[in-house]
Amino acid sequence: YEGKIFITQGFIGATENGVPTTMGRESSDFSAAVIGEAINASEIQIWTDVDGIFTADPRVISQAKYIAELTFEEALELADKGAKVLHPKTMLPAMERNIPIRIRNSKNKKSSGSLITSEIKQQNGAVSIAQKKDVILIRFSPFDKKNYPLLSEHISGLHAKYCISPLSQISDERGITFLFQHIPSVDFFIREISEIGQTEIQTNLSLISLVGRNILQ
């Protein structure tokens, strides 16, 4: 196939039975990453409407600057913490084969974009700030504080039942504090734990994350 250019669609896949279906949010980028992994590409390029990954959301912080290079781990952490340029699952196929990903702007071809790779020369410190909106905080204090192992198992079972995963979960002598992206299934989770303990809820929060290397040093 040398010298040939193949064009295919993203976002479309198939079930185990071969029935065509969509693959979910950001699956066009994911499709490119999977194909890149399959052919062991030298680079995977994702073309979008921004110059790359920025030090902050440029729609919120006008002084934000684009990042020329960052590691897979940093990009994965940023995506997980709310950065919109790449979905976390897009990075995984590239990481398996150590294939660099370059984010390019289809409206600004003069920009070389952001290169995501395994190793870069970088000083310690923050690389970028990510924001995840519509976060809910749940403070849960169980009525029966004597049997935490069973309580922990029950809570984990509810996470699995409603297909939710906390952004953060901290336990202390008073109970457990959860942070979740506020999706409808979280409300069912709250309803169930309210039957076995007292809950305090704060909504319309944002989770702000600093991503980088040895930030506290």
Predicted regions mapped to residue ranges:
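C-terminal catalytic "cap/lid" subdomain
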Residues: Y1-Q217
